[in-house]
UniProtKB/Swiss-Prot annotation:
It comes from Paenarthrobacter aurescens (strain TC1). Is modified by deamidation of its C-terminal glutamine to glutamate by the deamidase Dop, a prerequisite to the subsequent pupylation process. The gene is pup. The modification Deamidated glutamine is found at residue 67. Residues 29-49 form a coiled coil. The keyword 4Fe-4S does not apply. Belongs to the prokaryotic ubiquitin-like protein family. This is Prokaryotic ubiquitin-like protein Pup.
């Protein structure tokens, strides 16, 4: 058998690492406020649908034929 040479990856000295600062994390109360606002918007949308189409909404969930 022939001897196999192993090739080692060579480091590139021309590459430079740039230290990019990360954005500071939002304050916990700001994150909670954003999440709460999203939930509030969704609940408002559901309330609007129920106010305008409550009967149709309920009919969509009525079981038919013993299902």
């Amino acid at each position: 058998m022939a001897a196999q040479e192993q090739q080692q990856p060579q480091s590139r000295e021309t590459e430079t690492e740039v230290d990019v600062p990360e954005a500071p994390p939002a304050a916990p109360e700001a994150q909670a406020s954003e999440a709460t606002q999203g939930v509030d918007d969704l609940l408002d949308e559901i309330d609007g649908v129920l106010e305008s189409n409550a009967e149709e909404f309920v009919r969509a969930f009525v079981q038919k034929g013993g299902q």
